[in-house]
A protein has these predicted regions:
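Extracellular loop and loop/strand-boundary signature of outer-membrane beta-barrel proteins
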Residues: 1, 7, 11, 51-59, ...
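Surface-exposed extracellular loop regions of Gram-negative outer-membrane beta-barrel proteins
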Residues: 3-78, 82, 131-163, 167-182, ...
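Outer-membrane beta-barrel transmembrane domain signature of Gram-negative proteins
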Residues: 5, 40, 50-147, 201, ...
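Outer-membrane beta-barrel signature, preferentially recognizing the C-terminal barrel domain
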Residues: 6, 117-137, 222-262, 290-313, ...
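Surface-exposed loop/turn segments flanking beta-strands in extracellular/periplasmic regions
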Residues: 37-54, 95-124, 213-236, 283-290, ...
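Extracytoplasmic gating/loop element in the C-terminal half of outer-membrane beta-barrel translocons
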Residues: 159, 443-534, 538-539
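C-terminal beta-signal and terminal closure region of outer-membrane beta-barrel proteins
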Residues: 213, 217, 294-299, 341-369, ...
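Conserved small-residue
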Residues: 292, 309-416, 457, 539
Length: 583
């Protein structure tokens, strides 16, 4: 495995005229990645149970992006009036290339990189992707006596992700501010350092879709000595366009008692019109993917930040900051579209995005008499059986629709990934040149399906039984167990998402803690430095949670799977020691 990364930035600022400035910057970023995996013949033999040739798989990718911006800023100040104007242009470009190759039939297990000695090429694939974004933007601002504030802005973006006629998106915004403590009637309130009210409205855009989804592409593949060219598995839609989000925000900033107490309050409402998602299409096309602007959703919430200095002395100070956020997401409309079966559970009108549907477990079957009775009733209603593949020790699901048999229509909402609230608490203690700071991160009230349980119960991937299941599955001697029996390689209803796999994802985490020491001024002056310090930092030190898996924060991030967790790679715990120098 090899990788290298580069990022560079240059900029220039020029004062063209009095009050008129020109700014330009250019950013270049690149990332190269090469990886190879060699499977010796003996390893393949152990895995598949029969002699096999050695294999070599190589992966490589290259990514490069550029960004260039030009901006003019003008400010004019007269008396109590301050006028400002800004106009700019930006262009972003990105290009990625890569490929995956698989070779087989090496003469021995020592040829780790000599692909020329392979007897055959099992797979060869490569790709090239390009994207671009052009932007023009402007802003006008007015400030009267640092008391009344007004700002109007507009930006227009053109994205290569959309086809002709839909590439441009225009996004206006307006904001106002009132610095209340500068009013004459507040002169006697000397304990108020700052009291500012804010109100804003604006539009933003998103290109939440893969590149060139409006255009049909071809893809080639090779298997052994044969190769083929076929249509890419994406039905193009020339009508897709920018997602647009309207947001209204009310805010209040405050600071009291010489900044001993400060904070802010924000209440917002966001409405996204035409969010992009997989949509229904003609099955005869043979394509499984098709995107359209079909989802309308809203977000409303409150964000509170409160901080201060409970202690601020000559040698010792304690600074603390607490922020709490509450957000409520809701799917408002699907615009008469029927989401495909893979996505429909994640987008339920009236529910948050990512909501999980699953079966409700009635109980665990203790004898076949009960099953036979249910099957007999199901046959009377014209069904083959009550629940397919069921046996003693299995989950018996509730027939929620009352039709006499278990189908996917019996699934109900079992988990909502949206937490009741979340936030962080930062504390910094300073004693002379020594400083200790830490951040506690928390989330309360979210739910997720621990999907590992279904895989472990059924043994479909050959994995071992985890801590949650161990000693807690049904056996003839353990009939009061929470979980169904262990049956290897069986895709029964025991495998399906159900309410017994749902757990609270609340947690309290020590996100980071840093101890630092600033060198005395006398030492710094001798070293011709402006500042110097030593520090040691630990991240993700510990987590307090009832989640049974590795990490409650690593639930899947995709909309369709954000309410599930099958133990992806957890956040790593790290320790670092460093020196910070300022010249």
């Amino acid at each position: 495995y090899e990788s290298d990364q580069f990022m560079g930035n240059v900029y220039v600022d020029i004062e063209l005229l009095r009050n008129l400035k020109f700014h330009s910057d250019f950013t270049l970023a690149s990332y190269n990645y090469d990886n190879s995996y060699f499977s010796p013949s003996y390893l393949q033999e152990i895995w598949v149970g029969s002699p096999y040739y050695a294999q070599l798989t190589t992966n490589n990718s290259k990514y490069a992006s550029t960004s260039i911006n030009f901006r003019l800023d003008y400010n004019y100040h007269t008396g109590k009036h301050l006028f400002g104007a800004m106009a700019g242009y930006g262009a972003d470009r990105s290009r990625s290339t890569g490929g995956t190759n698989m070779y087989q039939g090496f003469p021995n297990d020592d040829n780790l990189d000599n692909v020329g000695s392979a007897q055959s090429v099992l797979m060869y694939s490569d790709y090239v992707a390009k994207s671009g974004l052009n932007s023009v933007y402007g802003r006008l601002s007015y400030d009267y006596d640092s008391r009344y504030l007004l700002e109007v802005s507009m930006r227009a973006d053109a994205s290569s992700k959309f086809g002709p006629g839909n590439q441009w998106g225009v996004f206006p915004a307006v904001s106002t501010g009132w610095v209340i403590n500068r009013e004459a009637f507040m002169e006697k309130a000397s304990w108020i350092d700052n009291l500012k009210m804010r109100l804003s409205w604006g539009q933003t855009g998103s290109t939440n879709v893969s590149d060139f989804s409006f255009r049909q592409f071809y893809t080639s593949s090779q298997y052994g000595e044969s190769s083929s060219v076929k249509l890419q598995d994406l039905l193009p839609n020339r009508g897709i366009h920018w997602e647009k989000t309207n947001e209204v925000n009310f805010g209040l900033d405050f600071s009291f008692f010489g900044d001993r107490l400060y904070g802010s309050l924000d209440a917002y409402y966001r409405y996204t019109d035409g969010a992009l998602a997989p949509a229904p299409h003609i099955l005869e096309s043979g394509m499984s993917n098709y995107y359209d602007n079909i989802i309308d959703m809203s977000n409303r919430g409150v964000e509170v930040s409160l901080g201060g200095y409970p202690v601020r002395g000559k040698d010792f100070a304690w600074n603390t900051d607490l922020n709490i956020s509450v957000n409520r997401n809701r799917i408002e409309s699907l615009n008469n579209a029927q989401i495909n079966s893979y996505m429909q559970d994640a987008f339920i009108v009236g529910k948050p995005a990512g909501t999980v549907k699953g079966y409700i477990v009635d109980h665990i079957v203790q004898n076949m008499d009960e099953v036979n009775e249910l099957n007999a009733k199901a046959v009377e209603k014209g069904f083959a059986e009550y629940q397919s593949g069921i046996g003693v020790g299995d989950f018996l699901m509730k027939d929620t629709d009352g039709n006499g048999t278990i189908t996917s229509d019996d699934r109900q909402v079992i988990a909502t990934p949206e937490p009741k609230f979340f936030g962080g608490w930062t504390n910094t203690f300073t004693y002379k040149n020594l400083s200790l700071s830490f951040l506690m991160q928390f989330s309360c009230g979210g739910e997720a399906v621990y999907s590992n349980l279904g895989e472990e119960i059924s043994g479909v991937l050959g994995q071992s039984v985890g801590r949650e299941l161990y000693g807690n599955t049904w056996t003839p001697e353990r009939t009061d167990a929470k979980y169904a029996r262990l049956v290897a390689g069986t895709m029964s209803y025991n495998y399906m998402a159900n309410d017994r796999f749902v757990f609270d994802t609340s947690y309290l985490r020590m996100k980071n803690i840093t101890l630092s020491y600033s060198l005395p001024k006398a030492w710094i002056n001798k070293l011709y430095l402006s500042n110097a310090s030593l520090f040691v930092t630990a991240t993700n030190l510990f987590t307090i949670t009832q989640w049974p898996g590795l990490d409650p924060e690593t639930v899947a991030t995709g909309i369709t799977s954000m309410g599930t967790n099958n133990d992806p790679y957890p956040l790593s715990r790290s320790f670092s020691l460093g020196v910070k120098l300022q010249f």
